């Protein structure tokens, strides 16, 4: 009996990718501006941190949950899901060229999403809003440079 219950528990926690854990999801929205105007065509990646904010890959690579681009008004809305044993730690990476001059590649801004915004199952109950962000600020905590999307074109 114990073996059967253990088997049922383990098989109920597998995802289609073969991971052990439970399916969790998150939705996020916001508006991005550049110099007071909508930041159009900015790429946003929805990620899940597997190494407590350190993007070293020592523990486990961070999980990619999807991407989108801002619309003509600078808005974005996206959701994603991931199987994890513990609670997911979602964040978005925003890749942009706002107020960047001729610098190579893009500015990359990480915005963490609180665990309280996550839900069990494939679809989140609510959408977490990061609000309106002005990307032209020169010194932003959590920002670095990225050449992941070299051909990214966007307007402001």
Curated annotation (Swiss-Prot):
State whether keyword Glycoprotein applies: yes
**Places the protein is found:** Secreted
Keywords noted in UniProt: Glycoprotein, Secreted, Signal
Q: Which Pfam families match?
A: TTR-52
Q: Which residues are glycosylated?
A: 151
Which residues, if any, are the signal sequence? 1-17
An example Gene Ontology CC term for this record:
extracellular region
Q: Which family does it belong to?
A: Belongs to the nematode transthyretin-like family.
Q: What is this protein called?
A: Transthyretin-like protein 1
Q: Source species, please?
A: Caenorhabditis elegans
Q: Which lineage do the record's taxonomy fields give for this organism?
A: Eukaryota, Metazoa, Ecdysozoa, Nematoda, Chromadorea
């Amino acid at each position: 009996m114990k073996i059967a219950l253990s088997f049922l528990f383990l098989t109920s926690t597998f995802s289609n990718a073969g991971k052990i854990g439970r399916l969790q999801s998150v939705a996020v929205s916001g508006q991005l501006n550049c110099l007071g105007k909508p930041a159009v065509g900015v790429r946003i990646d929805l990620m899940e941190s597997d190494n407590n904010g350190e993007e070293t890959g020592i523990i486990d690579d961070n999980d990619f949950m999807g991407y989108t681009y801002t619309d003509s008004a600078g808005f974005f809305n996206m959701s994603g899901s991931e199987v994890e044993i513990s609670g997911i730690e979602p964040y978005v990476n925003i890749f942009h060229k706002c107020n960047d001059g001729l610098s190579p590649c893009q500015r990359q801004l990480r915005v963490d999403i609180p665990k309280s915004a996550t839900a069990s199952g494939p679809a989140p109950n609510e959408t977490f809003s990061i609000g309106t962000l002005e990307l032209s600020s020169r010194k932003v905590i959590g920002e670095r440079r990225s050449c992941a999307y070299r051909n990214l074109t966007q307007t402001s």
